[in-house]
């Protein structure tokens, strides 16, 4: 049928790719960017949040790191801490590298926004990356009395809320615009989007309220992500 429409000289897919390769026109496949290095000597903590649904803010924080491509071909890294109850981004840091000091900076922002609240019932959940397992990060969590929880394998659903926030930032902001021209431009743009996300963007999983609205509440919300099925008791 395609021959009848486009003519007998139409190339098939494989022949077309071979022609591109022969003429040097194929683009190089970009190297994958990895933000998680779980091959390290530090202790890896058990997953404490299977079936757990927080009933208020500052009971479950989820953390993750994602990368942002720049127009120069380089990238920068966005370290995020999100409250799982309200879906509010409560801590973030944009950095040139994956050093743990930037992950700690995002955590300290989250602690500061809690404004002295009792965090002794807080669970901090993340992947098993070295940034979250290193002594300095663990010490920050121990200092506030938080429990530490980590994913047990590499399934994105094990840190689903954090992965969802990454996806929202990329699909609703980064993929709809040209690449940022500089680190400084990226920092301004991310700051603006996080403010918009927290204060103005209704969220399906919290009854079309904004994260900032829900962060001032407690009690069950209308919808929850799959994987957090059981409400915690006060």
Where are these regions (language model features)?
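Basic, flexible linker segments flanking DNA-binding modules
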Residues: 1-57, 155, 210-219
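Short helix-terminating capping/connector loops at secondary-structure junctions
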Residues: 9, 117-120
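Mobile genetic element proteins and their domesticated derivatives, centered on retroelements
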Residues: 16, 20, 49, 64, ...
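RNase H-like two-metal-ion nuclease catalytic core shared by retroviral integrases
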Residues: 36-40, 126-128, 134-138, 150-171, ...
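Active-site beta-loop-alpha junctions of metal-dependent nucleic acid enzymes
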Residues: 74, 92-117, 133
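Short small-residue beta-strand/loop micro-motif enriched in glycine and branched aliphatics
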Residues: 88-92, 149-151, 175-177
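C-terminal domain-tail junction helix/linker
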Residues: 142-146, 168-234
């Amino acid at each position: 049928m395609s021959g009848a429409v486009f003519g007998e000289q139409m190339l098939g897919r494989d022949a077309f790719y071979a022609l591109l390769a022969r003429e040097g026109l194929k683009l190089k496949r970009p190297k994958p960017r990895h933000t998680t290095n779980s091959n390290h000597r530090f202790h890896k903590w058990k997953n404490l949040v299977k079936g757990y649904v927080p009933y208020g803010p500052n009971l479950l924080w989820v953390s993750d790191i994602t990368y942002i491509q720049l127009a120069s071909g380089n990238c920068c890294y966005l370290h995020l801490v999100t409250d799982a109850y309200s879906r509010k981004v409560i801590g973030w840091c944009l950095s040139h590298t994956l050093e743990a000091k930037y992950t700690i900076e995002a955590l300290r922002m989250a602690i500061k926004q809690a404004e002295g609240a009792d965090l002794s019932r807080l669970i901090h959940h993340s992947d098993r990356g070295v940034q979250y397992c290193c002594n300095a990060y663990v010490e920050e969590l121990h200092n506030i009395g938080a429990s530490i929880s980590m994913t047990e394998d590499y399934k994105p659903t094990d840190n689903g809320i954090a992965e969802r926030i990454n996806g929202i930032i990329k699909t609703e902001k980064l993929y709809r615009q040209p690449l940022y021209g500089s680190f400084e431009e990226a920092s301004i743009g991310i700051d603006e989007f996080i403010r918009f996300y927290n204060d103005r963007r209704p969220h399906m999983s919290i009854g079309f309220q904004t994260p900032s609205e829900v962060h001032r509440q407690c009690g069950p919300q209308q919808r929850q992500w799959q994987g957090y099925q059981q409400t915690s008791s006060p």
